[in-house]
UniProtKB/Swiss-Prot annotation:
Binding-site residues for ATP, renumbered to this chain: G19, T20, S21, V22, D23, G24, I25, D26
Keywords: ATP-binding, Carbohydrate metabolism, Kinase, Nucleotide-binding, Transferase
Protein name from the UniProt record: Anhydro-N-acetylmuramic acid kinase
Function: Catalyzes the specific phosphorylation of 1,6-anhydro-N-acetylmuramic acid (anhMurNAc) with the simultaneous cleavage of the 1,6-anhydro ring, generating MurNAc-6-P. Is required for the utilization of anhMurNAc either imported from the medium or derived from its own cell wall murein, and thus plays a role in cell wall recycling.
Reactions performed catalytically: 1,6-anhydro-N-acetyl-beta-muramate + ATP + H2O = N-acetyl-D-muramate 6-phosphate + ADP + H(+)
Pathway note: Amino-sugar metabolism; 1,6-anhydro-N-acetylmuramate degradation; Cell wall biogenesis; peptidoglycan recycling
Residues that span the membrane, as ranges: none
GO molecular function: ATP binding; kinase activity; phosphotransferase activity, alcohol group as acceptor
A family per Pfam: AnmK
Protein source organism: Trichormus variabilis (strain ATCC 29413 / PCC 7937) (Anabaena variabilis)
Keyword ATP-binding listed: yes
SUPFAM superfamilies in the cross-refs: Actin-like ATPase domain (SSF53067)
E.C. number(s) listed in UniProt: 2.7.1.170
Length: 392
């Protein structure tokens, strides 16, 4: 149980996350009041702290399946925790005291649960590096970390975890909405209008690849000189190859019914290599290849909406790094026709730091004893408290 009196007091919380794009650590310092329907979050500061190049390369190699020793894994865990702690120390300058840190860490492995016969299920597994104990010690601030494992332990996917936060920050009394995150992997939260029973009707799942494939392709096409396509300008100069998009959409993941989750294990370097191999007969230019990969992201999102949502949303709000990709946004708007495609900035929540904000809120809820998962999104049979608390 939680104290309503304590929850009414403002709390300054830092949210930290590095997503599947491995661009760096997104840090958001927020002031939180309330809990759920009365939840109010003010962003005081937000910044992305790039990983050191050598550490980023090590993380990407592990995410791609490269085998490492336990010693190397331990060293990477410590290096990531140190980077997260430094981000927390930097973002709070001028805003002390800070009450709490919510640190997602860096996902290096994710395995969804699997059906193993009638009435049987093999539990999923997830590993986020950057241990909370070390962050709490280095910053002196109580830290909540390891958010996903509790949902997985009861049979859920441990993802997506953000839909419950989206529900209370971005829902509307009369309008159904999709909050579409365009990180390394795309994921959605479908939020119906706030009518009776609306919370039980929220849905969420990973739609498929987003920035991860595009960024990997840019690095490949430029021999590492560039890590992303700014504003999607390069892709915008190309022409999508629709037969390729149709071929790629036959991948079993896109036709798997939710709840579902994925990551670089499925849509990483090996998948991109196959995409390039598939494209060889078409003799695509680099711009055409990027345009076609962009179209895959768009097509997978629209396919998800039309196939698995109870109804199409009245508005779509984008967040994450891909929300700044103007070409991707334009293509998605074209595909969704009359449904307005906006960014969460236009609903009062930073599109750049929404995920970091969400983990600040999840940490706030954990400290107050409020469940953070939505079973309709993660597939868990019950609500659970998310995260492990490490005293600062």
């Amino acid at each position: 149980m939680y104290s309503s009196q304590a929850s009414a007091l403002p709390s300054r919380v830092i949210g930290l996350i590095s997503g599947t794009s491995v661009d760096g650590i997104d840090a958001a310092l927020v002031e939180i009041t309330g809990t759920e329907l009365d939840l109010k979050v003010e962003l005081l500061a937000g910044k992305t702290y790039p990983y050191p190049a050598e550490l980023r390369e090590r993380i990407l190699a592990v995410c791609a399946g490269e085998a490492i020793s336990m010693l190397e894994l331990a060293d990477m865990d410590d290096a990531i925790a140190l980077a997260f702690a430094q981000a927390a120390q930097n973002i709070q300058i001028g805003y002390q005291p800070v009450n709490l840190i919510g640190s997602h860490g860096q996902t290096v492995y994710h395995r969804p649960p699997k059906e193993a016969g009638v009435g049987k299920k093999t539990l999923g597994y997830t590993l986020q590096l950057g241990r909370g104990e070390m962050i709490a010690y280095l910053t002196g601030i109580t830290t909540v970390s390891n958010f996903r494992v509790a949902d997985i332990a009861v049979g859920g996917h441990g993802a997506p975890l953000v839909p419950r936060v989206d529900a209370f920050l971005l829902s509307h009394p009369h309008e159904s909405r999709c909050i579409q995150n365009l990180g390394g992997i795309g994921n959605l939260a479908y939020i119906p209008a706030r009518t009776d029973g609306w919370l039980s009707q929220i849905r969420g799942w990973d739609t498929g690849p987003s920035n991860s494939l595009l960024d990997l392709a840019v690095e490949r096409l430029t021999a590492g000189a560039k890590t992303y396509d700014e504003d999607g300008q390069w892709a915008a100069s190309g022409t999508p190859c629709y037969p390729l998009v149709e071929k790629w959409l036959t991948h079993e993941y896109f036709h798997l019914s939710p709840p579902k989750s994925t990551g670089r294990e499925l849509f990483g370097v090996a998948y991109l290599n196959q995409c390039f191999q598939d494209a060889e007969p078409y003799q695509l230019s680099p711009a055409d290849m990027l345009a076609t990969l962009t179209e895959l992201t768009v097509a997978s999102i629209v396919h998800s909406y039309r196939t698995f949502l109870p109804q199409m949303p009245q508005r779509v709000f984008l967040c994450g790094g891909g929300s700044r990709n103007l070409y991707l946004k334009q293509r998605l708007q074209l595909a969704l026709e009359t449904i307005p495609v906006l960014t969460t900035d236009e609903a009062g929540v930073s599109a750049d730091f929404k995920e970091a904000i969400a983990f600040a809120v999840l940490a706030h809820w954990r400290q107050l004893g409020i469940p953070g998962n939505l079973p309709t999104a993660t597939g868990a049979p019950q609500e659970v408290l998310l995260g492990e608390i490490h005293q600062g």
